[in-house]
Every structure is written in C-alpha cells, then in structure tokens.
C-alpha cells in the first residue's frame, strides 16, 4: 500500500436509491446521486446532438423523457453488473474526478450477499485497476459512525431494510434479518393513498414528486389510532405542498399513514413483521448474555429512518416486547441518512485499518474469494 499513501481512499456506499461517494477523511459524501442508468429509447433520434449511449444519475433523471431508466441495484443487491460498472465509472471520473493515481476503494455493501462482494472486487481490480479495496457491511459502518462497536442497527434505505446485531465490531450473521420493505414501498403507498383524495400520481416523474412529499411531510405517530381521531376532528395535521407546476395540494392523515407500514407491513398485504418486531427477533437470535447491550444500543440508519417520531415509536414498541426490567435505548443520529458513508470515511482513515486493505497483489494471487477471507 506504500505507493497509494499520498491519495485519499474513495468511500462508496451503493444504495438502491442513491449512490453516496467521496473521500476518506471528509465528514460528508461529495457526490450523492440516484442509482439510475438510462438508455435512449430510440437510437438515432438525437444523432448529432452528442448523444451518449447511456446516462447516469441526475443526467438520466433530467433526460428521462427520452430514456428507459433502470435501477441496477434492487433490494440492496446488484442485479445488473454492466450498469453497475457504468455507475462506478461515473462516480470515479465524472463526480469525484479521480485523475492520475488510482485510489484504494472502500465499497459498502448490503449484508448477506456473498456473490456481490466477489463480483465487485473483480470489477474494481480488473476494470478499474485499483491498487487496493475493501468491502464493508453497511450497518457495521453506521454503528462505527455512532461511536459504538456493539449494538443493533436497523438500516432502512430505499430498497431494503436489515437488522444487524454487532458485537465488538463484528456483525453476527446468524442473527441478521432482512425485510424487503423500505423507502420505495413507502413512496408507492403514499401514491396509492393520495388517489383516495383524488390526486393521481402514476409516472416515474410523478413518483419523484411523491417521494419529495414523503421526505418533507411524512411522520410517525406515537399512537396511530389517536392520531387518526385527531386528524378526523381537526385540521391540525393538514399541510399544503406546492407541486413543481405550481399547483398546491393538501395532505393530512396521509402524512402518518404512509410510514405506518414500516410497523405494520400487513397494511400493504405483506406477510412480514414490522421493523420493531424484526429488531426484537434479531436480538432474540443472539446469545442471551449480549442482549442487554443490544437493547441499550439500538441505532437507526438510512434514509427511511428519517421520519420525525420514528425513534419514540420504536422505543415504545420494543419496550412492549422486551423483558419488563430491560433498559431500552433507541439512538437516531441526526446525520443517519449518510451514516453508512460517514462510518466508511472514519474506517478508511484509521491507521490501524491500513493493513486490512486487499491489495492488487493479494487479489492476483488468490482471486475474488479473498474478499471473504479478509473482509467478513
């Protein structure tokens, strides 16, 4: 690694909805853009206009009228490697403008997906010729960012949610649980319940508008039934929202009905436990001796935990499930939207971490399987 000392490592958190990327040592990612690759629907329509064969991120978003948009990451797992390569290329050369020496790369991935980690190592070393790389589990990085090494992380993004118990820096794989319910489902649900008010949002462009509404206005009610009563009898929960075309719409109970499905997936015909129960089940799969440490360090992470009121509700629900004398603490760091990336930035900057990198030499010697030996 001596030759790469002079250039800061890159930290890249590949999310279903957004890619967060930047340099180790920074306190926030420099590039945050949608994980989208768009290809022209009709080739030749834009000849002579400098048309590219593919667009990534914000540019794909702004030209979506003439493109077919694809999300290469589904439910946190890469499903299209060619497109993923385009996203990384865009990240390194257009967003972060990495020139001359190739930097070492710390890539953050979802838990429980071994194949992906091998593939990403292969692309990093063989296509991008990085001198060194490391693959870290997203939730573990969020825990580091909160200043802990033991705790349970509920990481909920756009495509998938996970509960990951971590003891002294190591994730406990047998107790990790995955819930295929996250931000995109919440946006879809809000689109659906807005139709009851007569507001129709159907296209992918309109979905972005609803996502924006969700992020600005939705909140989690501490007592759902009581909140519904309040909403029926007064207009205190009503808020107006201006659409891009200037039209103003009003939403009320939808504001807390939308994130309710995180706690009650059955509302959208989904047979799964809510985030509180999934967290509890994860804790119960751990050794009885460490449960107290987990209950006392429940850390929220990811964009879909940004709702106002979610920590209080989570605390209330888990207190109801846990043994009565147990001390429950739910931590919702203000920067949790980016805590995976921040944890990666911290980790890649540590002097003690420098011997953890997988070097190009080690990769050439043992192939992609080295990822499992060194990273997990």
From Swiss-Prot:
Catalytic activity: ATP + H2O = ADP + phosphate + H(+)
Keywords from the UniProt entry: ATP-binding, Cytoplasm, Cytoskeleton, Hydrolase, Nucleotide-binding
Localization, UniProt: Cytoplasm, Cytoskeleton
EC number(s) from the headed UniProt entry: 3.6.4.-
Sequence intervals crossing the membrane: none
GO MF term set: ATP binding; hydrolase activity
Cellular-component GO terms for this entry: actin cytoskeleton; cytoplasm
PANTHER family: ACTIN
Protein purpose: Actins are highly conserved proteins that are involved in various types of cell motility and are ubiquitously expressed in all eukaryotic cells. Essential component of cell cytoskeleton; plays an important role in cytoplasmic streaming, cell shape determination, cell division, organelle movement and extension growth.
Record-stated family: Belongs to the actin family.
Miscellaneous comment as given in the Swiss-Prot or TrEMBL entry: There are at least 16 actin genes in soybean.
Protein name: Actin-3
Gene: SAC3
């Amino acid at each position: 690694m001596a030759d790469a000392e002079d250039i800061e490592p890159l930290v890249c958190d590949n999310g279903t909805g957004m890619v967060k990327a930047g340099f180790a040592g920074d306190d926030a990612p420099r590039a945050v853009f949608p994980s989208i690759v768009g290809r022209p629907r009709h080739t030749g329509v834009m000849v002579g206009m400098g048309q590219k064969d593919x667009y990534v991120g914000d540019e794909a978003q702004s030209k979506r009228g003439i493109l077919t948009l694809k999300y290469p990451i589904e439910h946190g797992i890469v499903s299209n490697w060619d497109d993923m390569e385009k996203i990384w290329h865009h990240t390194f050369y257009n967003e972060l403008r990495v020139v001359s020496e190739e930097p070492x790369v710390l890539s953050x991935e979802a838990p429980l997906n071994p194949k992906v980690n091998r593939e990403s190592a292969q692309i990093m070393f063989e296509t991008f010729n990085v001198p060194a790389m490391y693959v870290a589990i997203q939730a573990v990085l969020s825990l580091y960012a909160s200043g802990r090494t033991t705790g349970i992380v509920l990481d909920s993004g756009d495509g998938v949610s996970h509960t990951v118990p971590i003891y002294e820096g190591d994730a406990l794989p047998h107790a990790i649980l995955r819930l295929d319910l996250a931000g995109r489902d919440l946006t879809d649900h809000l689109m659906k319940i807005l139709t009851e008010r007569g507001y129709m949002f159907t296209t992918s462009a309109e979905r972005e508008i609803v996502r924006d509404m969700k992020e600005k206005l939705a909140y989690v009610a501490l007592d759902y039934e009581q909140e519904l009563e309040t909403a029926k009898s007064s207009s205190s929960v009503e808020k107006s929202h201006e659409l891009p075309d200037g039209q103003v719409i009003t939403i009320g109970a939808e504001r807390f009905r939308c994130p309710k499905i995180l706690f009650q997936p059955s509302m959208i015909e989904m047979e799964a436990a809510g985030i509180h129960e999934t967290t509890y089940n994860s804790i119960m799969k751990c050794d009885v001796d460490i449960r107290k440490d987990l209950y006392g360090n429940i850390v929220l992470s990811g964009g879909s935990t940004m709702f106002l009121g979610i920590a209080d509700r989570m605390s209330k629900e888990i207190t109801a499930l846990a043994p009565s004398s147990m001390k429950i603490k739910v931590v919702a760091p203000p920067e949790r939207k980016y805590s995976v990336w921040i944890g990666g930035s911290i980790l890649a900057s540590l002097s003690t971490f420098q011997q953890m990198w997988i070097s190009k030499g080690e990769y050439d010697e043992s192939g992609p399987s080295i990822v499992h030996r060194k990273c997990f």
